[in-house]
A protein has these predicted regions:
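Short helix/turn-capping signatures at newly exposed starts of structured segments
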Residues: 1-106, 110-129
């Protein structure tokens, strides 16, 4: 994984990076007739860099728009979900990424959405021509 370049290796078969397409996703074992319009949740938590994550992919116009990672190494009660955001901040720090970093290819954010009570690491890919 080279997060500073937007490259996230889910496993040997699924490597998400700038300009990753839905057509490429369809060639992986994770494709189960999803339409590429709605959010795609991978069925099982995935181990990335020795941590367990719930992984979601968002495509826009056939290209990756966002990869969302929710670390599920630890269980949090509904009222403590915001503490998961602290864990995500720590993970990004361990990877050498400053909070809410912008890159040429996109940006990485650790967010806590109070309205939906969800914490996640969002890797947003800018559309390229």
């Amino acid at each position: 994984m080279d997060i500073s370049k937007g490259i996230v290796e889910i496993d040997n078969e699924l490597v998400v990076k700038p300009n990753f397409t839905f057509e490429q996703f369809k060639e992986t074992k994770y494709y189960t007739n999803q339409d590429g319009i709605r959010i795609i949740y991978l069925d099982e938590p995935q181990i990335i860099k020795n941590r367990k994550y719930i992984v979601s992919l968002f495509f826009r116009d056939g290209k990756i728009y966002m990869l969302s990672l929710i670390c599920c190494d630890e269980e949090y009660s509904e009222k403590d979900e915001s503490k998961r955001n602290d864990l995500h901040d720590l993970i990004l720090k361990e990877l050498g990424v400053l909070e809410n970093s912008n890159f040429e290819w996109g940006e990485i954010k650790s967010i806590y959405d109070a309205r939906s009570n969800i914490s996640s690491i969002n890797i947003i890919y800018y559309a390229s021509t």
